[in-house]
């Protein structure tokens, strides 16, 4: 009598795959205030965007609850975002100048970055 091996899918929604989703732009968002929350709401149902992670220094940032409901990884340390999986685009809506300095190095690694005046302009469009 043949036996069937049953395997369980160990990947859960709270632990997204580190593999690249074909055709999707892999995005991380720095800042989970109003701007970051609005971006998550827009990107959440877009099949061409996969939000890899969200960072905010405040545990009380309004967007963190939304990120958790959407099964998006969250961190207080924005430097951890690039370790969460493949990243094509970083969007900085934190308003923190220190983050902008760090993102200059990220650009050199070939990752696209939207921050500063560009992020402010995008926020005004939303």
Model-derived features: positions:
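A short, basic/flexible loop-to-alpha-helix module at the beginning of a structural domain
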Residues: 2-24, 79
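Phosphate-coordination loops involved in phosphoryl transfer and adenosine-cofactor binding
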Residues: 23-26, 87
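Glycine-rich adenosine-cofactor-binding loop
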Residues: 25-41
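NAD(P)-binding Rossmann-fold cofactor-contacting core
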Residues: 46-70
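Conserved acidic residues
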Residues: 52, 86-88
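Short acidic-hydrophobic, aromatic-tinged amphipathic segments that line or gate anion-handling sites
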Residues: 73-80, 114
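N-terminal Rossmann-like NAD(P) cofactor-binding module of classical short-chain dehydrogenase/reductase
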Residues: 90-92
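Rossmann-fold NAD(P)-binding glycine/threonine-rich loop
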Residues: 97-126
């Amino acid at each position: 009598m043949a036996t069937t091996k049953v395997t369980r899918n160990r990947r859960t929604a709270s632990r997204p795959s580190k593999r690249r989703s074909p055709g999707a732009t892999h995005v991380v968002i720095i800042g989970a205030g109003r701007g970051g929350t609005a971006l998550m709401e827009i990107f959440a149902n877009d099949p061409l965007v996969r939000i890899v992670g969200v960072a905010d220094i405040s545990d009380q940032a309004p967007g963190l609850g939304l990120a958790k409901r959407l099964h998006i990884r969250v961190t207080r340390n924005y430097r951890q975002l690039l370790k969460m999986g493949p990243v094509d685009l970083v969007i900085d809506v934190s308003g923190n100048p220190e983050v902008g300095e760090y993102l200059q190095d990220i650009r050199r690694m070939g990752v696209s970055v939207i921050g500063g005046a560009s992020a402010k302009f995008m926020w005004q469009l939303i």
